[in-house]
Amino acid sequence: MRVLAAMSGGVDSAVAAARAVAAGHDVVGVHLALSAEPGTLRTGSRGCCSKEDAGDARRAADVLGIPFYVWDFADRFKEDVIDDFVASYAAGETPNPCLRCNEKIKFAALADRAIALGFDAVATGHYAQLENGVLRRAVDADKDQSYVLGVLTAEQLSRAMFPVGDTPKDRIREEAAERGLAVANKPDSHDICFIPSGDTRAFLGAHIGVRPGSVVDADSGEVLAEHEGVHGFTIGQRKGLGVQGPAADGQPRYVTSIEPETGTVRVGSARDLEVHAITADRAVWTSGRAPSGPVECTVQVRAHGGLAEAVAEAVDGGIRISLREPLTGVAKGQAAVLYRTDPAGDIVLGSGTISGTDARPNTQ
C-alpha cells in the first residue's frame, strides 16, 4: 500500500512511520504546518506542532529513507479547531481540541488530500488498535488515545493506520533508539499546541473579550462574585472562582452550571455535580450504522477518566445514555465515547457530543 505517515516530530509518529516502512509499504512522511505565525505555537521539545517539531520529523524521515514534505493546513486548523474551540467556550461548553483536530484535520482534510494523491491510508502515532474497521483501546492503558479517535466515522477508520497501538510506550522508545531515531527520548506533549503559554483562560479572554456576569450560589441564588466571562469556567471547577470562603455547610464550592445567555455561573456542593443521564448530539457509530436498540456499554466523558457503566440508545441522530452509577464533572461540549468490554481491548462503539445532562436517571 501507499501510506502517508503523519509525522508530528515526536517519537510515536516516527516509530509508526518506521513500522509502516518495515511492513513493506510505500511510505511518504508529511508534517502539518498548523500556524501562519510560528510564534503562536509552543516551541521547544514538548510541542506537537511547533516549528522545532518539523525539523525533528524531517530528521526522522531522513533516517528512515523516506520522502518528506511539510503541508500547510494553517487556515483549516484555525477554522476547524481554534475558532471552534473559542466558540465552544464562549457558549459555556468544554471542548477537546485534539478530538476536533482528529475529526476535521488529520482524518478529514489530510486524509482527503492523501487519497486524492493516490495514497491508500494515513498512518499516525496514536495509541489505539485498529483491525478490520474495529477500533480498540491501546495495549498501553496509560497511553490509550481511543477516546480522541472515537469521533471518527467508519469511512475515516477505513483509511487509517495506528501502528504503535499494540505496544507499550516504553518499548516504543526502545525501538526508536534501536532504529537510530533521535526523538527516542523526546518528552511527550500534554498541553494544547496553539496555547504556547499554557494559560487557556488568558487565551480565551484575548479572543472573546470581557463578557461580564455573576457567580451565583446554586441553592440560595445569592450573588457571590462577578466575573469577566463564562469562558473562564468549566463544570466541576473548584479553583479560580473568585469566591471567598466555603459554602454554608463548610464544604468547597464547585461550578455546577454555566448559563452563557445570562453570563451566570452557578456554584454548589459536590453532590450537585452528580449526573445520572446524558444526552449527546452529532452521533457517530464506528460500524457505520446506529444500533437498533439499547446497548450495554461503558461511557467515557473525558480523555483521562470519567468512566461509568451505562445503557446507550440512538435517538434522532443523537444518543441517550443512562448511567449505572453517577458521574461528576460532565460538561457540555465534551465527547461521550461508548465502549464494549472485550478481552482483546475494549471496542469503541461510537460517540456523541454532550448537549445535556440530568441528575435523574432516564426513565424512557
Curated annotation (Swiss-Prot):
Q: Where in the cell is it found?
A: Cytoplasm
Alphabetical list of PANTHER family matching this protein: MITOCHONDRIAL TRNA-SPECIFIC 2-THIOURIDYLASE 1 (PTHR11933:SF5), TRNA 5-METHYLAMINOMETHYL-2-THIOURIDYLATE -METHYLTRANSFERASE (PTHR11933)
Principal place of residence: cytoplasm
Q: What is this protein called?
A: tRNA-specific 2-thiouridylase MnmA
SS bond partners? C101-C193
Q: Which residues bind ATP?
A: A6, M7, S8, G9, G10, V11, D12, S13, L32, G125
Q: Residues at site: Interaction with tRNA?
A: H126, Q334
Recorded source organism is Rhodococcus opacus (strain B4)
Q: Which gene encodes it?
A: mnmA
What's an example Gene Ontology biological process for this entry?
tRNA wobble position uridine thiolation
Matching Pfam families, A to Z?
tRNA_Me_trans, tRNA_Me_trans_C, tRNA_Me_trans_M
HAMAP family associated with the record = tRNA_thiouridyl_MnmA (MF_00144)
